[in-house]
Amino acid sequence: MIEWSKLIKGTLIKRYKRFKADVKLSNGHIVTAHCPNTGSMKSCSDPQRTVYLSKHNRPDRKLKYTWELIEMPTSLVGVNTGIPNKLVKKSIENRLIKELSDFEKIRSEVKYGENSRIDILLENKNVKTFIEVKNCTLLEKGICYFPDAVTSRGLKHLQELQREVHQGNRAVMFYLIQRMDATRFEPASHIDPVYSEELKKAYENGVEILAYDVNIDTKRIAINRSIPFKL
């Protein structure tokens, strides 16, 4: 579980230049917040929606606010892509993810592959488990999709995970759904067909797929349950 610092409520005016969002606070002031998400944010960036910001007082920060959550009709949605790695690691450490509970050592951001870093590496006497974590927010008719934009980086990760399996290690693609209203996970073949086909290939070659959603409110976010997937 990760607890938010006190969040500030506002109304989204617009997201622009990918990393910025203008928000009208409840006191009427308009602020520019950092948007910690490089994706298209389809289905979770509608203007006039209620959003929640964290505030940071570090003197070196140009933007004092960070956009954390948005209220959509059927769920709060977490937009901060820095959250999934932290939440998944904490959940693994607390043995909350049964598929990833057999380990003696856990590390983050370990170099591997071709100039890459694996999000989480689990180790025991018998095997290394390489875990790549992806943030998922795109929802259409109850199905959560990844990616929400073409991703060459994501494609590279799938290829590197397959190489780890070939070398005798375990590899896992972990899709964290930062919302509570998804019934299933699927690769977004209508957005990035190349990634979708590579995910199918990776699965056939032994890369495991896990999709979990969260419980989320304005005080905290916690891992919730395993969600079925369809390739």
Which residue ranges define each predicted feature?
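Conserved catalytic cores of phosphodiester-cleaving nucleases, focusing on short active-site segments
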Residues: 10, 118-148, 161
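Short, charged beta-turn/beta-strand-edge "cap" motif at the junction between a beta-strand
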Residues: 14, 55-60, 177
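Short aromatic-glycine-enriched beta-strand elements
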Residues: 17-22
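Short nucleic-acid-contacting surface segments enriched for D/E, G, S/T with interspersed K/R
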Residues: 39-52
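Acidic-basic catalytic patches of nuclease active cores, encompassing PD-(D/E)XK
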Residues: 42, 74-107
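OB-fold/S1-family single-stranded nucleic acid-binding modules
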Residues: 58-75
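Nucleic-acid nuclease catalytic cores
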Residues: 142-152, 162-191, 213
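Domain-level recognition of nuclease-like catalytic cores that cleave nucleotide substrates
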Residues: 178-231
